[in-house]
Regions:
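Short, small/polar residue-rich loop motifs at catalytic or cofactor-binding pockets
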Residues: 300, 417-420, 481-483
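N-terminal signal peptide c-region/cleavage motif recognized by signal peptidases
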Residues: 16-18
Length: 615
């Protein structure tokens, strides 16, 4: 890897040699003297689709798309210095541990779909966490937690935060696994940008400051009634959450990244970091052991797949929820012509409330199956082949009233938000990566490992305490997981990554995004930015982004939907890219710059701070 000047060192040199003027204070719109000004002077874009916030980024040699600019630049730095798309994905994810720690950390889960150009195949990694040895339904019952038969979906009876829903983290194992199998560089190289920024700090943006909310983590008489002192020490600046424009540093995380650079994943799962995790867990009444960490292994699995308008849609399989996007698309493909007497989503169009009604009803049907069956396939048989068959989709058409909203089931407990990052990368060899990494909730469990600068996630909150459920908590089992990432192939060739973060929004968001692109013909940036809905099975509410609410909200309410207008915070964030074959580029390479015969296009959701960067 070529030697480059540290961005931190460069900034320090500039500050040392120049005096700068002090600008006006950075503040949010709501804190200005005239908040109404903000919505009154919104500009109007005239190029491309009306919905899109900017043009697509396009380039031949390599691309990184994610939710935070410094993280995207970290991945691009790796690409430009000899790394491939897999190396760039790990570097980007590590930097997001620094810049979006409420969303993602090495104490959480990881899934990835990797298209390996040399093998002409999509490989799927499940590096999600397993319940520790002592995690049983009986133990939780004795602690006062019980299954609620009136609300029996994922999460029923489980505590939402604190140490009890912490599962063994899989992210670091996954980082090392993808590097060893597909990467060109080492931990030492790909973790360097993140280590530098963790030590030197970075300024907090408005969106990051808004999301920076520590949850209660420590129990008094019940779960989670006070903040973890180690979390306050690590994530607050001068005793308070950081404000926009404030510099945030995490030297403890820098130390952890340096340990990984020198000792690899063993430092996390078998060394001093493992000892610190277990000590913290046991101090709070958790059951994780050193053996749980040392024995952790992720899995290489086969994707769930279906065909939609001739495109192969690959999604994460159980215990991830992503496969429900495939079921939604199957239902739409089979049933829309039945429901609309030969019509299509494209012929209806998004100004017609039936277009949205059909999407929503398809989502309800697929999520009913998702909540009923989704679980760790190593412990329970998930009938995925049946659920994703054309015949099964066709059998569901009669369950929907084309003119009136249905009552969905079964119930489940999900918050509106989901604190997750997604990213997409591609390189000049044709490798492409679709990646999702998460803490689950904002700052996960709220429990920080002292001295190491990372939070423990709370994904175990999506187990259930129903002893008869396939998703009931038990040792070494993976819980139901909202994380979703996908990949699209066409004619057995790689086409597009599919990523959208946002808790229970993810599978339904994937389906909406793919409909935008393949039915309506939206470009990637327009598809990322277009208004979306979010439906909750319980309490059967339909959230519509305000422009969509203004367009069809009243008509959907008249059809029986319980509708509310919301902003984009509930709608997740899309980060996608697509390969476009172009034979004219086959001879364009040189000895120093090579690339596949084509280029990449991208879409980065304006609801986040992110961007697509490329060269």
């Amino acid at each position: 890897m070529q030697k480059s000047i540290s961005p931190i060192a460069l900034m320090s040199a500039l500050v040392a040699s120049h005096a700068f003027a002090q600008g006006p204070k950075l503040q949010t719109c709501e804190s200005t003297p005239q908040p109404a000004f903000c919505s009154a002077v919104r500009g109007v874009r005239t190029e491309g689709w009306p919905a899109q916030s900017r043009s697509e980024v396009m380039a031949q040699h390599g691309m990184v798309v994610t939710s935070q600019p410094l993280a995207a630049q970290a991945g691009l730095q790796i690409l430009r210095h000899g790394g491939n798309a897999i190396d760039a994905a790990v570097a980007t994810a590590a930097m997001l541990n620094v810049t979006e720690p409420m969303m993602v950390g090495m104490g959480g889960d990881l899934f990835a779909l990797v298209y390996a150009a040399k093998e002409h195949k999509v490989f799927v990694l499940n590096a999600s966490g397993m319940a520790p040895t002592g995690a049983t339904v009986d133990r939780f019952n004795k602690l006062g937690y019980a299954w609620n038969p009136k609300n029996w979906g994922p999460g029923s009876g489980m505590p939402a935060g604190g140490i009890l829903p912490v599962t063994v983290p899989g992210a670091v194992w996954g980082w090392q696994a993808v590097l060893k199998r597909f990467g060109k560089l080492t931990f030492k190289e790909v973790l360097e940008p993140a280590a530098q920024y963790a030590q030197g700090g970075f300024p907090i943006s408005e969106r990051i400051a808004h999301d920076w909310r520590l949850p209660n983590a420590l129990p008094l008489q019940a779960c989670c009634t006070s903040l973890d002192p180690d979390s306050i020490k690590t994530w607050y600046v001068n005793g308070a959450q950081p404000r926009p424009g404030q510099i945030f540093r995490n030297p403890d995380l820098a130390r952890t990244l340096r340990l990984l650079q020198s000792k690899g994943a063993d430092a996390f799962y078998k060394g001093e970091i493992a000892q610190a995790i277990v000590a913290k867990s046991q101090a709070l009444g958790g059951s994780m052991t050193l053996e749980d960490l040392a024995g952790y292994k992720g899995e290489w699995v086969e994707p769930a797949r279906t065909q939609y308008h001739g495109y192969d849609i690959l999604e994460l399989p159980p215990p991830a929820q992503a496969w429900a996007a495939d079921e939604i698309l199957n239902i739409l493909q089979a049933c829309v012509p039945v429901w609309s007497t030969g019509g299509t989503l494209a012929s209806l169009g998004p100004a017609n409330p039936l277009y949205w009604h059909f999407l929503i009803e398809a989502k309800k049907l697929a999520y009913a199956d998702l909540y009923r069956y989704n679980a760790d396939p190593n412990f329970a048989a998930v009938p995925l082949a049946k659920l994703l068959s054309e015949a099964y989709a066709a059998s569901l058409c009669g369950k929907v009233d084309p003119q009136h909203a249905s009552i969905p089931g079964p119930p489940a407990n999900f918050s509106n938000s989901g604190d997750t990052i997604v990213l997409s990368t591609a390189d000049d060899e044709g490798n492409m990566v679709s990646w999702v990494n998460s803490n689950f909730s904002a700052f996960g469990s709220g429990v920080t490992v002292p001295g190491y600068g990372f939070i423990l996630h709370n994904r175990g909150a999506l187990f259930t305490l129903d002893p008869k459920s396939p998703n009931a908590i038990e040792p070494h089992k993976r819980p139901y997981n909202t994380l979703s990432a996908g990949f699209v192939m066409h004619d057995d060739r790689p086409l597009m990554t599919v990523t959208l973060m946002g808790g229970d929004m993810q599978a339904q968001g994937h389906a909406q995004l793919l409909v935008d692109i393949f039915d309506l013909g939206a470009n990637l940036q327009a598809g990322a930015d277009m208004a979306r809905f979010r439906h909750a099975q319980v309490p059967n509410t339909l959230s519509l982004e305000t422009p969509l609410y203004d367009l069809v909200g009243a008509k959907l309410a008249a059809m029986g939907h319980t509708v509310k207008s919301v902003n984009g915070e509930e709608m997740g964030g899309v980060q996608i890219l697509m390969f476009v074959a172009d034979p004219s580029l086959a001879q364009a390479g040189t000895d120093t710059i090579k690339h596949v015969a084509g280029y990449y296009r991208s879409g980065s959701d304006f609801r986040k701070d992110g961007e697509a960067v490329a060269w």
